[in-house]
A protein has these predicted regions:
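Conserved Radical SAM active-site core
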Residues: 1-4, 17, 35-99, 103-117
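N-terminal [4Fe-4S]-dependent radical SAM core
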Residues: 1-22, 27, 35-41, 160-161, ...
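Short cysteine-rich clusters marking metal-coordination/redox-active sites
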Residues: 30
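P-loop/Walker A phosphate-binding loop and immediately adjacent motor/lid segment at beta-alpha junctions
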Residues: 77-86, 134-165
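A generic structural signal for alpha->beta connector loops
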Residues: 94, 120-121, 145
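Short Gly/Pro-enriched loop/turn and capping motifs at secondary-structure junctions
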Residues: 104-106, 129-133
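Non-cysteine beta-strand/loop elements that form the S-adenosyl-L-methionine
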Residues: 120-130
């Protein structure tokens, strides 16, 4: 797995100061995507244990309120690596994890390994970016078809629970 960027202090993807990992590789190739360079699965640098340790250390910073994982497409990576990462974040920091995916909730919950990952995630912004539905006033997403899902409540209730309906 490769990553496109790693930010210790990021205020552009979620509320507050978060540490953010941008994974490389995405087959969705949404028209109007702002991060086209990250479509390439070999873009950026190799993701290593040292990179993961650094990311965890960023999240542990007292000023950081959570972790963001986006891309690229996190659910098109080696899912064992993503699962290991989200487990480590929760076990070592207990801070919220926010993930973005071009897949919908309905697509993700059909795949066991994706559900294993979601068990550790707090928020999922789901759905492909749609240029004709782009809205620059949206806070955590790029187009109106995307949803901010409370993952833990959705898993518990067996239905999608939106954060900002």
């Amino acid at each position: 797995m490769y990553y496109a960027d790693l930010r210790k202090y990021d205020t552009s993807n979620w509320s507050g100061i978060n540490s953010t990992l941008f994974v490389s590789g995405c087959k969705h190739c949404c028209e109007g995507c702002w991060n086209k360079e990250a479509w390439n699965f070999k873009y950026g640098k190799p993701y290593t244990k040292e990179v993961e340790d650094l990311f965890i250390s960023y999240i542990k910073d007292e000023h950081v309120v959570g972790a963001c994982i986006l891309g690229g497409e996190p659910f098109q990576q080696d899912l064992d690596i993503i699962l290991h990462l989200v487990k480590r974040i929760k076990e070592e920091t207990d801070k919220p994890i926010h993930m973005w995916s071009g897949y919908t909730w309905e697509e993700l919950i059909k795949r066991d390994k994706c559900v294993d990952i979601l068990l550790w995630v707090d928020t999922l912004v789901d759905g492909r970016f749609e240029l004709d539905k782009r809205d620059l006033t949206l806070k955590h997403k790029g187009s109106t078809n995307q949803r901010e899902i409370n993952v833990q409540e959705s898993l518990k209730r067996g239905e999608i629970i939106l954060i900002n309906p």
